[in-house]
Structure formats: structure tokens, C-alpha cells
């Protein structure tokens, strides 16, 4: 029996900076265990600040590409993780996914500040997303272990 990798979509409201950070951490922590896709509601070029703070964490996301929202709606995903600031942004609804999680994370592009202040915001966002990705991986491992114990 062929096992397919679970497909995970990280969907950021705003630009894809947060979803690219989440994708980078998931790939770093799990290798190719998941098929991972990033989407930002607002199309944007690569985000140098996100790449820079991820490089500080030892992860290169500069080569990651985002999928368009329209294309993501055509794909089946086992997990959809929306990343938005629930105080300022509406969490997208994704009705056709098996598992949907909503992560409340501020949009680093929507905060004030320049230079080092902005970089500090990106670092806090990076660290928060890292914790959430680690929890997702741990929860996924527990689900997989419980499936194996049933068999």
C-alpha cells in the first residue's frame, strides 16, 4: 500500500511572510514528511526581512515559492493552517480541508517601526510561529501513533 504524504497549506492573510516562515520551520523539522504549500492572500514579491530572520535561525527560505489563492482552492489539503492577527484580520474559511487550524499571529508588515524595530517584530513572529509549528508536529505525531495502535 502506497502512503501519500499529508498535504499542509499555510495560508496567511496579508502577504505570505508568515506562511513562508511556517513552511520553513515545518520543512526543517520534518524533512519531506509533509507536502507543504504557502499562500499569501496579497500577492507580493519575496520578503527579505522574513528571509533574514529565518537565516538567523539557520533556515534558508529564500528559494521557497508561494502558490496563488486561486490555485490553492483547487488542491485537496489534509491540513489548512490559517495565520492571521484575529484582532485586525478575518480568519479565512477553508471548507474543503480535513483539518483546519487558526493561528493568531500579528502581521509583521502591519506593525509600525523601521530597521531594527521592524526586525525585532519579525523575530518575535518567527519565534511564535516556530512554537506553533513544533506543537503541530507533536500533535501530528500523536495522531499517527494512535492510528498505529488501533491497527
Protein language model regions, located:
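Phosphate-binding/catalytic loops
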Residues: 88-151
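Conserved active-site segments centered on acidic
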Residues: 1-71
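Short glycine-rich anion-binding loops that position phosphate/pyrophosphate groups of nucleotides
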Residues: 14-16, 85-88
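Alpha-helix C-terminal capping/helix-to-coil transition sites in glycosyltransferase folds
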Residues: 74-76
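Residues at the C-termini of beta-strands that transition into short coil/loop
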Residues: 40, 84, 104-106
